[in-house]
From Swiss-Prot:
GO terms for biological process: lipid metabolic process. CDD domains: SDR_c (cd05233). Its EC number is 1.2.1.n2. This is Fatty acyl-CoA reductase. The active site is at 166 (proton acceptor). Coiled coil: none annotated. GO terms for molecular function: oxidoreductase activity.
Length: 295
């Protein structure tokens, strides 16, 4: 992160209020600390109160300001109560960062009797995020100011195999946000989607092969959010994400072939790799050819 961008970031967030979901670990934890260190009041949302209290204590130890709001973001009534608690605690929210998410790595042919995978992924990644937006948006409209940042996925651009439930939920939020963006433009509210590549967080830990593929660190992912806050673009993607989007737009069959090769190259479970759970040379080469992609 260059010094000029960092200075602009501090200028943009100092004295502001930022609500971050999924703030107890990974990207959410990292960006919460970063925003608090820049002088904002961070509102931390996640399921577990004890973990949130630890994050709050760490932020306050560094001189930052944080408030915690434990909430199950798959429960719509709980989100309504959360929203009421937040607006009773602070009079506005300047930044809403929809970071909380659930990912499922499972091929469609392995999901014939697992419709609940699609339901629970949509419940958190789409319905939970939309419910929170609908609750907070009237206050942003009234103030004619605000930014909503959605942590999406490179899989939305590349059509990642084995992630149909996850990608569909992120794509739904993406489509909702594109429609909303035009509606709130006159109210000076901006909406940014960040198509994150794989990030080394607890969410990807169960997939052991991801130990051996290129990923971003949570700090690098936080840099993208910092850029989003400063520049307020409609979308942010890596070079691979943009290339995947262009390829699918002008040559969808090529995109299909490349994703199919990856689908057949990588196993559905680490058990198929044996006890060492390592990638062979061909798998490593393909993973490096498409850095940050979900396989």
């Amino acid at each position: 992160m260059n010094k000029k961008l960092e200075a602009l970031f501090r200028e943009n967030v100092k004295g502001k209020v930022a609500l971050i979901t999924g703030a107890s670990s990974g990207i959410g934890l990292t960006i919460a600390k970063r925003i608090a260190a820049a002088g904002a009041h961070v509102l931390l949302v996640a399921r577990t109160q004890e973990t949130l209290e630890e994050v709050k204590a760490a932020i306050e130890q560094q001189g930052g300001q944080a408030s915690i709001f434990p909430c199950d973001l798959t429960d719509m009534n709980a989100i309504d109560q959360l929203s009421q608690q937040i607006m009773a605690s602070v009079d506005h929210v300047d930044f809403l960062i929809n970071n909380a998410g659930r990912s499922i790595r499972r091929a469609v042919h392995e999901s014939f009797d697992r419709f609940h995978d699609f339901e629970r992924t949509m419940q958190l990644n789409y319905f939970g995020a939309v419910r929170l937006v609908l609750n907070l948006l009237p206050h942003m409209i009234k103030r004619k100011n605000g930014q909503i940042i959605n942590i999406s996925s490179i899989g939305v651009l590349a059509n990642a195999t084995r992630f149909s439930a996850y990608v569909a939920s992120k794509a739904a939020l993406d489509a909702f946000s594109r429609c909303l963006s035009a509606e709130v433009l006159k109210h000076k509210i901006s909406i940014t989607s960040i198509y994150m590549p794989l990030v080394r967080t607890p969410m990807i830990a169960p997939t052991k092969i991801y130990k051996y593929v290129p990923t971003l660190s949570p700090e690098e992912a936080a840099d993208l959010i910092v850029y989003a806050i400063v520049k307020r673009p409609k979308r942010i993607a890596t070079h691979l994400g943009r290339l995947a989007s262009i390829t699918y737009a002008i040559a969808p069959d090529i995109n299909n072939i490349l994703m199919s090769i990856g689908f057949n190259l990588f196993p559905s479970s680490t058990a198929a790799l044996g006890e060492q759970e390592k990638l062979n040379l061909l798998q490593r080469a393909y993973a490096r050819l498409f850095p940050g992609e979900h396989w």
